[in-house]
A protein has these predicted regions:
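Short S/T/G/P-rich N-terminal loop/turn motif that feeds into the first structured element of a domain
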Residues: 1-62, 69-73, 102-105
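Short hydrophobic/aromatic beta-strand or adjacent loop that forms the aromatic wall/cage
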Residues: 61-63, 96-97
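A generic structural signal for short hydrophobic patches within well-formed alpha-helices
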Residues: 73-74, 83
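A common structural junction motif
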Residues: 34-35, 82-88
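C-terminal end-helix/capping segment
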Residues: 88-105
Length: 105
């Protein structure tokens, strides 16, 4: 877990196809109440369904993008015990998810 070469921000991108909105709502509520994004310096850039699927984006797939000050901060959020053990399990069975951390620039 090292910062990117520029020491700049990193982005957590999660894509999802949701099948159970109630489970996702419980996950979203718990994540929001936990304050984990803020505790790790994360800020939501965008979330939801695309405004315009211009090429190759599948129907029914949404995304959330969260900006962190560094890759280390993003990884600290993602791998935190609170997220992995208390929050993330709440979305189990809600849909299919993909997640990746990207360095800016």
């Amino acid at each position: 877990m090292t910062d990117n070469a520029s020491g700049g921000p990193a982005f957590l991108l999660i894509t999802a196809r949701i099948g159970d909105q109630a489970k996702l709502a419980a996950y979203d509520a718990a994540l929001s109440a936990s304050g984990l994004y803020a505790a790790h310096g994360g800020q939501i850039v965008f979330g939801g369904q695309p405004a315009n699927r211009v090429e190759g984006w599948p129907d029914g797939v949404g995304a959330v993008c969260v900006r962190f000050s560094s890759r280390t901060a993003a990884e600290s959020f993602w791998f935190s015990a609170k997220y992995q053990h208390d929050i993330k399990p709440l979305r189990r069975g809600a849909g299919t998810f993909q997640a990746a951390i990207f360095d800016a620039g």
